[in-house]
Amino acid sequence: MALWGGRFTQAADQRFKQFNDSLRFDYRLAEQDIVGSVAWSKALVTVGVLTAEEQAQLEEALNVLLEDVRARPQQILESDAEDIHSWVEGKLIDKVGQLGKKLHTGRSRNDQVATDLKLWCKDTVSELLTANRQLQSALVETAQNNQDAVMPGYTHLQRAQPVTFAHWCLAYVEMLARDESRLQDALKRLDVSPLGCGALAGTAYEIDREQLAGWLGFASATRNSLDSVSDRDHVLELLSAAAIGMVHLSRFAEDLIFFNTGEAGFVELSDRVTSGSSLMPQKKNPDALELIRGKCGRVQGALTGMMMTLKGLPLAYNKDMQEDKEGLFDALDTWLDCLHMAALVLDGIQVKRPRCQEAAQQGYANATELADYLVAKGVPFREAHHIVGEAVVEAIRQGKPLEDLPLSELQKFSQVIGEDVYPILSLQSCLEKRAAKGGVSPQQVAQAIAFAQARLE
């Protein structure tokens, strides 16, 4: 039976019912709805709506229902209830009879669903934070094991300067740390309870909403009933965090897809995260990474869709707001799955050090070192930049790396160049000179690993 049927003389058209009902997706709020109902029953005792004995009977029935839902959640979808609130109330009435009809006193589905969704978001943020930190730890461990793996760093997908695989890993640790911070920051604004705000104007019962918030594990209660039932900022914030986080994971995936190509050959992915071709027996495709990259778009779409849903809504609750859940559920599920999958990819990755080093020695990635050498000899940087550009052109013409050009050739471009230039052009020198904070020098990378390990403990 609908929770609102008394006003109507005709039954809802079945087509409208199918269009209107939300149980097929808000069933995921079942546990939160039951937990919120237990807390509400306690609040009703404080204002004399329920006796202590009635409340105990309701709480016992709700706890039995909670265990039943955890054991067999699929039972919810076997119902034709309008939404999860109707389903829980119907099951409660089945268990305790008329007493179950007293529970909704002073409560609206508007503050009820807002509370349920916030509780679900809090639970899910906790899962996301755990998965995020697990991936950070996997990256730090991979970095620690590959501090000596020299590889080319890229700009414009052109070899630019030597870096290490460890330094590359730590770049993504920084991105994930910002994702973690965004989630923690969003959690602060999320951690306020709307329960007790009624449909929009507040409840007519003098319930201690701060006490009620505490029972539910919220830091405090909201301050304005009209805003409380209308607010979906937390949905937008979490979708935004997910969208940014998925961009980071997509870039991570794209890098590794490139590193795994036959043309680059820097890494070998585990058989556990790759697949083959139905036609070409030799293929080993990076499907896990491609799916991470591909799933980024659906999360961006969820954020955009929710922005458009909310932008024109008047206060307070409107049925449009039912659209907040499917996109949110899908986006956060996707982000969580991709965090886990990225960690699994790292678990079996093999870095091909000889190939990485060979690539780092190609493409004149040490050209900047020669320019810095000239600057140290008193040549203005802009002039040094031009000199080195000419030297690179000559090296390309001869098919040699810069360090293989004889001194007489190098001195054609600048007389200040001496024998001491050759150690400067080595890969090790290129790395060691980047010793400022955040640089790629072995010392800085080791410090960054130690800092990340300490932060993640």
From Swiss-Prot:
Pathway: Amino-acid biosynthesis; L-arginine biosynthesis; L-arginine from L-ornithine and carbamoyl phosphate: step 3/3. PROSITE patterns: FUMARATE_LYASES (PS00163). One of its GO terms (cellular component) is cytosol. GO terms for molecular function: argininosuccinate lyase activity. It catalyses: 2-(N(omega)-L-arginino)succinate = fumarate + L-arginine. Its EC number is 4.3.2.1. One of its GO terms (biological process) is L-arginine biosynthetic process. It is found in: Cytoplasm. Keywords: Amino-acid biosynthesis, Arginine biosynthesis, Cytoplasm, Lyase. Gene3D superfamilies: Fumarase/aspartase (C-terminal domain), Fumarase/aspartase (Central domain), Fumarase/aspartase (N-terminal domain). Belongs to the lyase 1 family. Argininosuccinate lyase subfamily. This is Argininosuccinate lyase. It comes from Shigella flexneri.
